Amino acid sequence: VGQIAKIKGCRAVGVAGGPEKCAYVVNELGFDACIDHRADDFEAQLATACPDGIDIYFENVAGRVLEAVIPLFNFWARMPVCGLIAQYSMTDLPTGTNKLPALMRAVLTYRLHIEGFIVRDFADMQADFRRDMGQWVRDGQVKYKEHRVAGLENAPATLMGLLKGENFGKVVIEVSDDPTG
């Protein structure tokens, strides 16, 4: 998403888990900055990286990252919600302070636009997306990294590793030999 934002002329700040991943996001993917969400001073680093606030936040994580983003929203900011990975492995509701009132206050104060983002809602745009994305990948404007794991039997452990941030790239489970190469 950040690479597309850069193509469209936006400033892009990424969030990743660890210095190696952050370096990749900046040096290989071309983001303007990337903040390690595991850093003790993550919130301060994010605020420094976004001195003019945040206009669009593509939500995939929730948890600490979302909490750090909320006070940085600009008026009329947009937040498409595509995932909440920090909550996927939760078996109970979080304890402690309820963060919903802070989010609702931000929605009101900053006139935020929050909308669920489900890919099938944009099926009518699929041909355009495939054309554009294919060209961007061929031109090297969009890059990707795969974290390949052989064998379907390794899928459960790989999923648990994904939830812990142990992967580096898009997880691909190889269930048979690659016929292309």
Predicted features and spans:
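Terminal helix/beta-alpha structural elements that buttress the NAD(P)+-binding lobe
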Residues: 1-181
